[in-house]
């Protein structure tokens, strides 16, 4: 496995320079684009990694999975009264579909859906940002995971579209807490800094029927785990989920920080990071690396 990871990084490294680092979040625009890392973590606790897999980066929308899991833990099936679990087919920050469907987001991984999930968690936790940080620390076993306040502040200063979505949902009665407070929590979640190794470890419960072996925690039950993996498979890569299923064939979740987490149910989790994005906002070299890994090992679930 170690040799394979090294080979794959060598093969996809020439793609660096063909994508573009996210620049709509000013604090992310200065990230060094040449970085590339990958980590594989097995349900039995074996870890393999290569490249910049130990270097923390801004996880951005990957945090939406953690938020969803927290909401499921405390509110169960009730959350689906306020949002769906269908692919949207629209840009992740689109307002058109939200207006047409009367303030009920299609799924928890578009921005509007993630904001509803944060609104649910805001009602549950006295300090949502701290609760999320502590939850993630337990899952990955790294007490040093923190939220980058500079990135969070930068995102808050450029919050107009997310605020518009939140206020639109509030006008339809699907947003219960103070919008600005929820936005602050949401941006602190997105600004969490984790490495490929951290994320591969943190997501291992989704490869093991909801059980996190290194923390000893039953995070979700088996049915809930299948549901989260299913939503990742259909909606985890913005409006490129179909292409990812075609090329990689695994449940996954991406973020504009350049990270992608993928789950091989019953076996492994894989995290890859390369900051340069394609036109859909997903890591260009990251998808290529996951495609090669899935092909060579035969990991596709299809």
Curated annotation (Swiss-Prot):
Disulfide bonds: none annotated. One of its GO terms (molecular function) is glutaminase activity. It is an enzyme of class 3 (hydrolase). This is Glutaminase. It comes from the Bacteria. It catalyses: L-glutamine + H2O = L-glutamate + NH4(+). It comes from Pseudomonas aeruginosa (strain LESB58). The lineage of its organism: Bacteria, Pseudomonadati, Pseudomonadota, Gammaproteobacteria, Pseudomonadales. Substrate binds at residues 61, 111, 155, 162, 186, 238, 256. Pfam families: Glutaminase. Homotetramer. One of its GO terms (biological process) is glutamate biosynthetic process. InterPro entries: Beta-lactam/transpept-like, Glutaminase. Keywords: Hydrolase. Belongs to the glutaminase family. Its EC number is 3.5.1.2. Signal peptide: none annotated.
């Amino acid at each position: 496995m170690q040799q394979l990871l090294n080979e794959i990084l060598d093969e996809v490294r020439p793609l660096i320079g063909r994508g573009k680092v996210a620049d709509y979040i000013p604090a992310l625009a200065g990230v060094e684009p040449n970085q590339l890392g990958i980590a594989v973590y097995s349900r039995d606790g074996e870890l393999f990694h290569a490249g910049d897999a130990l270097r923390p980066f801004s996880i951005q929308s990957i945090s939406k999975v953690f938020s969803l899991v927290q909401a499921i833990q405390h509110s169960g099936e009730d959350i689906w009264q306020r949002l769906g679990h269908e692919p949207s087919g629209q840009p992740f920050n689109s307002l058109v579909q939200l207006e047409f469907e009367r303030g009920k987001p299609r799924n928890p991984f578009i921005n509007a859906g993630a904001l509803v999930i944060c609104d649910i968690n805001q009602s549950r936790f006295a300090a949502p940002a701290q609760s999320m940080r502590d939850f993630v620390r337990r899952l990955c076993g790294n007490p040093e995971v923190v939220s980058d306040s500079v990135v969070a502040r930068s995102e808050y200063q450029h919050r107009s579209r997310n605020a518009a979505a939140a206020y639109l949902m509030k006008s339809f009665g699907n947003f219960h807490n103070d919008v600005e407070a929820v936005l602050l929590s949401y941006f602190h979640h997105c600004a969490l800094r984790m490495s490929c190794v951290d994320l591969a470890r943190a997501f291992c419960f989704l490869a093991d029927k909801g059980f996190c072996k290194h923390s000893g925690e039953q995070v979700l039950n088996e049915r809930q785990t299948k549901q989260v993996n299913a939503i990742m498979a259909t909606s985890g890569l913005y409006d490129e989920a179909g292409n990812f299923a075609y090329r990689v064939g695994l449940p996954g979740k991406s973020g504009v920080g350049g990270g992608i987490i993928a789950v091989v149910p019953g076996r492994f989790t894989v995290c890859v990071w390369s900051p340069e994005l394609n036109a859909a906002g997903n890591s260009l070299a990251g998808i290529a690396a996951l495609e090669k890994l899935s092909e060579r090992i035969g990991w596709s679930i299809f």
